[in-house]
Amino acid sequence: MNPLNLSTFIVFTLFAASATTALTCFQCTTSEGSDYCVSSFPKPSQCLPLMNYCTKIITTSNGAISVLRSCNVVSLDNTCMETGTGKICSFSCDTDACNAGSQFHCNRFQLPFLLTLF
């Protein structure tokens, strides 16, 4: 292999490897501590392969707040839905550490799935 082809191969390989690095998301739940995952949370960590979305799900029920920040295979709609005792909101994004913010939502089709998480 001549030097030009070798250089091209190395550059292409490095570019391809950097383009396929895994997404990083904040990953925590309020079950790990009362304020944990609400206003303070760990550094973002690498998601498993095929998990291309960061999600944040906030559930309020009778004044109590539960938060789940995680990696996900599918994108959740950015919506909120009222429940009998509060609401469930979800937010999805696809860039590193994007699930830290306060924007969130969910819809009625996701409610049965989301309720199984808590």
UniProtKB/Swiss-Prot annotation:
One of its GO terms (cellular component) is extracellular region. The scoloptoxin-05 family has remarkable similarities with the three-finger toxin family commonly found in snakes. The keyword Disulfide bond applies. Belongs to the scoloptoxin-05 family. This is U-scoloptoxin(05)-Cw1a. InterPro entries: Snake_toxin-like_sf. It is found in: Secreted. It comes from the Eukaryota. GO terms for molecular function: toxin activity. Disulfide bonds: none annotated. It comes from Cormocephalus westwoodi. SUPFAM superfamilies: Snake toxin-like. Contains 5 disulfide bonds. Keywords: Disulfide bond, Secreted, Signal, Toxin. Expressed by the venom gland. Residues 1-22 form the signal peptide.
